[in-house]
């Protein structure tokens, strides 16, 4: 939300933690997403509630020439906007959004946050994904995000819950996301 507010770019979340921009807003092939930021968090729990939260955020702000193998999957805010970006504004708005959502969770309204995550993560419904199990690669169609944050994936008549591993979005040669 901080990137959306500070830049006007309609970024999305690609489950679980990538901030991406649909190619309709850039010069890529239709249906691709370019990563502009990533979020990692850890919330150790004792009992029902987290005792602390550690959050790491990386935002690609400056224009960058990416290696050929990344150029269709990575981008930056300045590249997308074709103008300089006020880094302080991106930081302030991102921290303000984190503060707002921390308050929502603190007040016991986790479902509100989960619903917003789902709204900002359209690829979590109806997208092809491939992931590895111990036995083999599996493929399915995303079927939403569970109340505990797991990605539901429909495989025929079964629904799998993904909580960790490596996911390829789209065709098997698509974007890989480490969980």
What are these regions (language model features)?
Residues 1-179:
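Catalytic beta-strand/loop module used to bind and position nucleotide/cofactor moieties
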């Amino acid at each position: 939300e901080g990137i959306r507010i500070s830049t006007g770019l309609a970024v999305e979340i690609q489950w679980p933690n990538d901030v991406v921009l649909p190619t309709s807003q850039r010069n890529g092939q239709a249906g691709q997403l370019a990563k502009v930021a990533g979020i990692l968090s850890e919330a150790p729990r004792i009992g029902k509630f987290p005792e602390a939260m550690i959050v790491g955020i990386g935002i690609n702000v400056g224009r960058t020439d990416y290696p050929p193998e990344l150029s269709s999957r990575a981008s930056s805010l300045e590249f997308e906007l074709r103008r300089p970006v006020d880094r302080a504004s991106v930081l302030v708005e991102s921290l303000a959004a984190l503060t707002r959502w921390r308050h929502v969770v603190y007040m016991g309204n986790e479902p509100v946050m989960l619903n917003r995550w789902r709204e900002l993560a359209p690829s979590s419904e109806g997208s092809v994904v491939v992931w590895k199990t111990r036995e083999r690669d599996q493929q399915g169609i995303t079927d939403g995000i569970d109340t505990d944050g797991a990605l539901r994936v429909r495989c025929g008549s079964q629904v799998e819950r993904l909580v960790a591993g490596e996911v390829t979005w789209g065709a098997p040669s698509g974007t890989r996301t480490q969980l």
